[in-house]
Amino acid sequence: DKVTLKNTHINFTDQFIRPNYRANLTELKGQIGPLHPGKAGKIDIRGTIDKSAPLQISGTIDPFSEQLSFDIATTIKGIDLPTFSPYSGRYIGHLIEKGKLSVDVNYQIQQGQLSAENKIFLDQLKIGEKVDSPDAVSLPLDLAISLLKNRKGEINLRFPVSGSIDDPKFSISG
């Protein structure tokens, strides 16, 4: 009735992007559950991404209810941004030279309503060399980054997401 993780490792590879994106989740510990119909189960998982970025997932989930119901918070601290260069190269036409990413998100679904808070922190983001990509958007990237950075070279983004997951026009991506 529960899933227990003890020093678990997950090697993730996104083969839909070239070059492939890879992430290694290590030292995963915690549990999901117990899970029973009519009662929300607890989630508490901790670990590390790529040997340096702490990961924490906590909250509750009721997978057996008539309507999906959960309240999950995830925190990741200090992922090296250059590892995301396969995505930045494809979608913005530049590799990432340096920087760190921290994420603090909380997603809740109750009675078909999504309520989410997203906090994104980029520290010392520096865009690298240009790469050719037919999927890259054309935008003044250097200007956008310089407008978002504070004096310390940090970018703090905070945005809520809400809506009915049953609405056919609802989209997290806009």
What feature does the model see in each segment?
Residues 62, 66, 75, 94-100, ...:
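Extended terminal
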Residues 89-92:
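Extracellular loop and loop/strand-boundary signature of outer-membrane beta-barrel proteins
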Residues 1-85, 163, 168, 174:
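Elongated, acidic membrane-bridging lipid-handling scaffolds
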